[in-house]
């Protein structure tokens, strides 16, 4: 059990402590809250919508993996379906800092990989850094997205990022989280490669055309996938490995359980994720084999 979940329960509002315990300690809890669960918590707590989301932030931050900074950040996004998705910052000891994932990126990619096509709002412990503001500006819902911080009035993303630069400035009309199927195929039948290819076909890479996907197989048999999330400003792009690692951590698993990995990408893309994927996985465990396929 995640001990920080237990600590979050201890400090949760008394009126919803029992209900929250039933939800977050359930064996099938996947770091999400359904619209019905959130409505029940609203009714039981007597809190306003934004107040409840802020009260839930410690549960999102409980998923933080921060061996470098010991700085735990949580984020909660609400998908267009009404489901709430937790996210938290992720750091990789031994890898360069550019491999770090911010809490906002974590929650957004969590929602994306679970099928959401946009988010309506995001709630965060701390004011989003410029990197994350730019990352969020790539979203399908960037123009309407609302940002909620503790003890602050809700503001729009565009208020946090005035005169913003985004996909439209580069002639791109499809934002991150657009439902896509690039329909690439391969004759390779290895399950972990097939899973990585499925992630590739969902990826957002309009600038380099390097559609790519990663899959991670655990010793217990579970497989987690990540699709590449490219950004108009380039540097805030989120590699497919990091997206997969986020899904793994939010499902309650550890890096030590990774047994195999696969990266599939487009051969004619103008960049490659191979070197960074290999070096980052080597920082986690140099014995993880990586299957690579360029199609």
From Swiss-Prot:
Cofactor remark: Binds 1 zinc ion.
EC number, UniProt record: 3.5.4.5
Keywords assigned: Hydrolase, Metal-binding, Zinc
Reaction equation(s) it catalyzes: cytidine + H2O + H(+) = uridine + NH4(+); 2'-deoxycytidine + H2O + H(+) = 2'-deoxyuridine + NH4(+)
Domain of life: Bacteria
Domain CMP/dCMP-type deaminase: 48-168, 187-295
Annotated GO CC locations: cytosol
PROSITE patterns xref list: CYT_DCMP_DEAMINASES_1 (PS00903), CYT_DCMP_DEAMINASES_2 (PS51747)
Residues that coordinate or bind Zn(2+): 102, 129, 132
Annotated InterPro entries: APOBEC/CMP_deaminase_Zn-bd, CMP_dCMP_dom, Cyd/dCyd_deaminase_Zn-bd, Cyt/Deoxycyt_deaminase, Cyt_deam_dimer, Cytidine_deaminase-like, Cytidine_deaminase_bacteria
Disulfide bonds listed in the record: none
Binding locations of substrate: 89-91
A GO molecular-function annotation: cytidine deaminase activity
Active site: 104
UniProt GO BP: cytidine deamination
Essential cofactor(s): Zn(2+)
CDD domains to which the protein is assigned, alphabetical: cytidine_deaminase (cd01283)
Transmembrane annotation, as ranges: none
Signal peptide segment: none
Function text: This enzyme scavenges exogenous and endogenous cytidine and 2'-deoxycytidine for UMP synthesis.
Family that this chain belongs to: Belongs to the cytidine and deoxycytidylate deaminase family.
Subunit structure, as described in the record: Homodimer.
The protein's name: Cytidine deaminase
Organism, scientific name: Vibrio atlanticus (strain LGP32)
GN (gene name): cdd
């Amino acid at each position: 059990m995640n001990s920080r979940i237990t600590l979050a329960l201890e400090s949760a509002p008394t009126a919803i402590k029992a209900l929250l315990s039933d939800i977050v300690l359930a064996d099938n809890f996947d770091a999400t809250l359904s619209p019905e669960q959130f409505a029940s918590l609203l009714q039981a707590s007597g809190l306003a919508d934004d107040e409840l989301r802020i009260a839930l932030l410690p549960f999102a931050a409980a998923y933080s993996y921060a061996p470098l900074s010991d700085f735990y950040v949580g984020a909660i996004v609400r998908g267009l379906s009404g489901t709430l998705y937790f996210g938290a910052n992720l750091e990789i000891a031994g890898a360069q800092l550019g491999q770090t994932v911010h809490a906002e990126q974590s929650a957004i990619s969590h929602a994306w990989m679970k099928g959401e096509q946009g988010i309506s709002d995001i709630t965060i412990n701390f004011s989003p850094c410029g990197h994350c503001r730019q990352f969020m500006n790539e979203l399908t819902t960037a123009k309407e997205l609302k940002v909620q911080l503790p003890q602050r009035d809700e503001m729009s993303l565009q208020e946090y990022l005035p005169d913003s630069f985004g996909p439209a400035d580069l002639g791109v009309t499809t934002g991150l989280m657009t439902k896509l199927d690039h329909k690439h195929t391969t004759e390779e039948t290895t399950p972990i490669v097939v899973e990585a290819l499925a992630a590739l076909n969902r990826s957002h890479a309009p600038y380099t055309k390097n559609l790519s996907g990663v899959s991670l197989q655990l010793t217990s048999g579970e497989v987690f996938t990540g699709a590449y999330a490219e950004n108009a400003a380039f540097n805030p792009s989120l590699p497919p490995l990091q997206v997969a690692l986020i899904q793994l951590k939010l499902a309650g698993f550890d890096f030590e359980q990774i047994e195999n990995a696969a990266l599939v990408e487009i051969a004619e893309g103008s960049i490659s994720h191979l070197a960074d994927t290999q070096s980052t996985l080597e920082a986690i465990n140099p014995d993880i084999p990586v299957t690579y396929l360029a199609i």
